[in-house]
Every structure is written in C-alpha cells, then in structure tokens.
C-alpha cells in the first residue's frame, strides 16, 4: 500500500518547490513506489542529510531518520575509498536485512550534480532486486532537480 504523504524539505522546514522541481521529484518518487515490493522512497541531499521528498514509509520506517543515517553510510564509504586511494565512484549501496532491501543510489547524471541520492526500501519477499536496481537507474536518468 502506498502512503500518499509526499513531502518536500529544505533544511529543517517543509517548503513549496517550484513547479518544474515538484513535478520531477514527485514523478520520480511515484515511479519508485511502483517498483515491486517498494515500502518507501526518499530523495536525499547527502551534503546536509536532509530529504527533499519522501513517499511511503510509515510507522516503522521514518524516512527522514533513514535519510540522515544513510548519509553517514555514504560519507563513511567515501572516506574509506579515499583512504584506499580508489579512483572510482559509488553507483549504489545495498543493505540486505532479513525482511528488507535498502538500496541507496547516488545520482550521477549530467543534469544533476548536487550530491543527491535516492533511498529505496523494498520488502524482500515481494522484490526482484536486479529489476529494482534497473528501474532505479532509469528513474535516475530522467530525474532533473
């Protein structure tokens, strides 16, 4: 069941976004929620840790808390890559739980270089991980913020 609570955030306050941004963020989040097994999705600024928009989630999945926590996961991985002198970029990070997949997809398309990521939570019993990764890549390619 999709929670229709769609929120946009800027710093700690909810904001009204320009029409073009709103349509693109809203469309991307709604498309992500059509992925089989989707429980919740956020578009997150990993510089600040704040979510720009959430869809889904619920009582047991606070997407704002998850956004901040997953920002730390990304920062830790980037520090590790720097320590190892890896000249590469993170495409996505998968966290596998007993009942869920948590997929963190850093946005890399040329129109979107603001340090954003999509965070998607999937029910393991209903999700096809390979297909979900493919669909999230497609959503990323079309997203303009």
Q: Can you describe what each PLM-predicted range is?
A:
Residues 1-145:
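Non-catalytic interaction/Regulatory regions outside core domains
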């Amino acid at each position: 069941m999709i929670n229709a609570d769609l929120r946009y955030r800027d710093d700690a306050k909810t904001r009204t976004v320009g029409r073009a941004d709103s349509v693109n963020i809203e469309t991307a989040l709604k498309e992500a929620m059509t992925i089989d097994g989707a429980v919740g999705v956020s578009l997150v600024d990993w510089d600040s840790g704040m979510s720009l928009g959430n869809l889904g989630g619920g009582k047991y999945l606070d997407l704002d808390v998850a956004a901040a926590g997953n920002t730390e996961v990304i920062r830790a991985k980037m520090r590790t890559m720097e320590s190892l002198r890896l000249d590469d970029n993170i495409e996505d990070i998968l966290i596998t739980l007993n009942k869920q997949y948590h997929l963190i997809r850093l946005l890399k398309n040329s129109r979107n270089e603001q340090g954003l990521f999509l965070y998607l939570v999937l029910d393991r019993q209903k999700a096809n991980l390979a297909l979900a990764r493919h669909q999230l890549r497609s959503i990323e390619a079309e997203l303009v913020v």
